[in-house]
Amino acid sequence: SPSKAKTLNKYLGKDYEVLASYGHVRNLLSKSQGINTENFKMRYELIDRNKKHIDAIIKAVKKSDEILLATDPDREGEAIAWHLAEILNEKNLIKNKSIRRVVFQEITKSAIIEAIQNPRDIAIPLVYAQQSRQALDYLIGFNLSPLLWKKIRYGLSAGRVQSPALRLIVEREIEIEKFDSKEYW
């Protein structure tokens, strides 16, 4: 976020240029083009509203020797770091440059310095976890909901979390309705 970038710039000084990615930088292609269901290969496109931020990052990377990706320390942040690295790699901007991941749990000067002194590679298992979540959302929710609109009623929705949760609620309600209360002494 821009406010985090500003704080990091303050802590790190003029030897570093900190830029915000403004969250996710790429999305799956729209409609049925985002995931090939034969091999589950995912296809991405740059999010339009983030193009200017990516352009600023590209400009800064051209002047730098080292790239540190400091996105959030969760699977979504890891995926954002991976997407940034992929974009830079596609533009041949990381050849002969170090690109590393820095992770911190708090925005304090000591935590930031500690993270920069101990960079790591992008955690691909976390990236895969985020991609799996995104693929399931796409394949189940984005595709099943329109089918429900056509076959049952417009406005209905389905999703990877919502559908099983709804089933649990319905099953519990059926148990409650079937319950036969009896007095015991």
Predicted regions and their residues:
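C-terminal or mid-to-C-terminal helical accessory/interaction module adjacent to the motor/catalytic core
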Residues: 62, 107-185
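Intrinsically disordered, low-complexity regulatory segments
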Residues: 2-134, 148
